[in-house]
């Protein structure tokens, strides 16, 4: 059984738990709410990977953050790479495998953003924006995966 975003009850519960970490009591507003959303998923996922790379450059490097940075960049850029692979899949099975990986990597990206905020709390506002994008990508891939 799935909710309106195509998530199972356990996924939805996990998403709500994730959101509580980010809730600082203030209403959150996107930096540019008037900007047009990108509906080309290949472009959107590539832009997401690029934004994560730019964010990672601002993270101070130390023994703790170095490992998280590597994991974060790997997970976030894998979302777009696997979407591109799914787009060129030669079989339904290959397509579903790649889309399933996109889902997992989007969720993993949210996790590593949370860990970066724990290690470098002053980066929370920038990490929050990226976390929201990862949160939006996950149900998109869930719906694609379930409907194919």
PLM feature segments, named:
Residues 1-148:
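Amphipathic alpha-helical assembly/interaction segments
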């Amino acid at each position: 059984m799935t909710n309106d975003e195509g998530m199972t009850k356990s996924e939805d519960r996990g998403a709500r738990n994730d959101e509580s970490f980010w809730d600082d009591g203030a209403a959150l507003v996107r930096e540019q709410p008037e900007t047009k959303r990108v509906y080309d998923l290949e472009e959107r996922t590539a832009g997401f990977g690029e934004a994560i790379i730019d964010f990672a450059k601002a993270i101070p490097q130390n023994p703790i953050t170095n490992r998280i940075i590597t994991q974060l960049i790997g997970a976030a850029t894998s979302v777009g790479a696997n979407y591109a692979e799914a787009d060129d899949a030669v079989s339904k099975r290959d397509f579903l495998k790649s889309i399933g990986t996109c889902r997992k990597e989007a969720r993993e990206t949210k996790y590593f953003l949370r860990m970066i905020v724990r290690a470098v709390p002053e980066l929370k506002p920038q990490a929050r924006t990226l976390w929201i994008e990862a949160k939006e990508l996950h149900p998109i891939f869930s719906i694609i995966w379930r409907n194919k």
